[in-house]
Amino acid sequence: MITKVSGFLFRTFREDPATTESRGYGFLLRAGYIRQTGSGIFSWMPLGLKVRHKIENIIRYEMGQVNAIEVLFPALFSADLFKQSGRWSEYGDDIFRLKDRRQGDYLLAPTHEEAFTQMMKEICTSYRDLPRTVYQIQDKYRDELRPRAGLLRSREFSMKDAYSFDLDEKGLRQSYEAQKRAYKKIFDRLKIDYVIVKANAGAMGGSVSEEFLHPTEMGDDTFVVTADGSAFNAEVYVTPPGPAIDYSNAPEAEDCETPGVISIPDLVNHMNSSGRFIGRVIESSDCLKCLLFRIEYAEVQNGNPSNLVVKKILERGFEYIGFLVPGDRNVDLKRAQVALSPLTIEPADNRVFECNPSFVRGSIGPGLSGVFYCADPRVSLGSSWIIGANRPGVHRIGAIAGRDFSFDCTLDVSSIKTGDKSEWGPVTVKRGIEIGHLFQLGLKYSNALGLKVLDKDGYNKAVFMGSYGIGVSRLFALIAEKNCDERGLKWPAVLAPFDLHVVLLSSARAELIDSLTDCGLDVLVDDRRVSPGVKFTDAQLIGVPKIIVIGDKTRGEDVEVWDRANDQRTVLPLKEMIQGVIQGVIQGVIQGVIQGGDTGGDTGGDTGGCTER
């Protein structure tokens, strides 16, 4: 098929928009693959749609290989099902809510567990109807607080979500593993690096959850790799508790004047220059800081949360939470939010301190009224710390946990650092972007929505469910980010919007294009009346892997072939070039399928491991 640029919906730009946060995102905008229409909202242009459809078709093929059946649900749903499952409240402000003219509650679905469950409830009545795995590729909606990085964190995004339905837990595990294998094949064919990590189920619910993370410093997910190869999202990583220490002979805690000290570095410098610690250097890790947050009470289903820490907070009506963490650490807000779900927390601002005179900046410590204290696991019984004394310019030295101060619970929410000790040895901390997520939901939605079938003995039995998501638009953005240089995009052949990009420089040789008509390739011909420099610049920006230059420098059937992957140029007869491209396309498809079948390297299984490809 021949597509001429002169008749195509197409425009390129020479400069990145001011809001561009990454090189690949900038090229997608400049080359006209997508257009931003609002904060976190994008239009897909013809070039972008062609690449997106190729990604979707690879996903469809691999879903078909594990007998998953495609359907398509609406994005707009009545809130009734979501209220039944509890997610209407559990999702908080992350969902778009709206009302119809009769004041009925509706939402733009972030995922479709409830809809799939209701559909299967109406279709499946017997054990003979199971197992089934059903999926869709559809746009989803989440009210992101801070959309960023283009398609990587947007309010509207394309996603493949699949759901499995099984009669028992064994069947669920089999369906889960089938989807996991399919995901490996998909990402291998797309040549996307990934790590499989143990993850938090969050508002989705269920017992077992794993993420496919693409390692990149652009990522907003932190994951931990242990010495034995196990990998965990930081949200679920468990810090080993510090050992209990005998403090029977420990000296009494002392108050120390610390005028002007408002930070941990100030406190460390003051202590080391005070002369109190002869022969010892005080470090940040010797100090225990209290980070104060304001608690925002979200609606809690039935008023009886399963989270025991949250239950304590609700029962006693605390307004504030104080995290006691070593001075060389900070609170990881994502870990804290997971640990305290469905409550939300916000750092204490100036107004909090103005309304609470007992909250002394720089000297906050344990013991304040109205504060629920959560201590880091390293704050073990008998451990000694330098703490704030809750008085201006005063700290306490040698305060013993369990003797001089107490706390309401131990909560593992502090930041994790490379080199931290674990039961598997030192850990390595990395960043990544989630590209896939697997959940064993169990009976959560089946019980909530009444999905049951008759078993062999004629008894009603709740159906076990799994949920499996892939971010399609996010994959598109990551592939662009990975495949570019300083001049533009460099799409792999299997995903490129066209097989060939012809730069026509000589109208006298335009008849050569006719021989491309029936070759079976998808060809973009730049026939515009613009300078050669503009055409070459746009060809590099768009990133089709093979650029064919038809100009006066070659004669007869010869054309200049420009390989965008390595920027090498050769002169070949047109027919030979066409055959080479066709063979490359065929070989790329075959190789992708074969590579997709290789599941080697997974050390995870049910026990959880790290697969890095």
From Swiss-Prot:
Q: Does the keyword Nucleotide-binding apply?
A: yes
- TM ranges are none
Superkingdom of source: Bacteria
Q: Where in the cell is it found?
A: Cytoplasm
InterPro entries in UniProt: aa-tRNA-synt_IIb, aa-tRNA-synth_II, aa-tRNA-synth_II/BPL/LPL, Anticodon-bd, Anticodon-bd_dom_sf, Pro-tRNA-ligase_IIa, Pro-tRNA-synth_IIa_bac-type, Pro-tRNA-Synthase_IIa_type1
The entry's keywords: Aminoacyl-tRNA synthetase, ATP-binding, Cytoplasm, Ligase, Nucleotide-binding, Protein biosynthesis
A single Pfam family, by name?
HGTP_anticodon
The residue range of the signal peptide is none
Chief location: cytoplasm
Gene Ontology MF term list: ATP binding; proline-tRNA ligase activity
Quaternary data: Homodimer.
Q: What is known of its domains?
A: Consists of three domains: the N-terminal catalytic domain, the editing domain and the C-terminal anticodon-binding domain.
Q: Which family does the UniProt entry place this protein in? A: Belongs to the class-II aminoacyl-tRNA synthetase family. ProS type 1 subfamily.
Q: What name has this protein been given in UniProt?
A: Proline--tRNA ligase
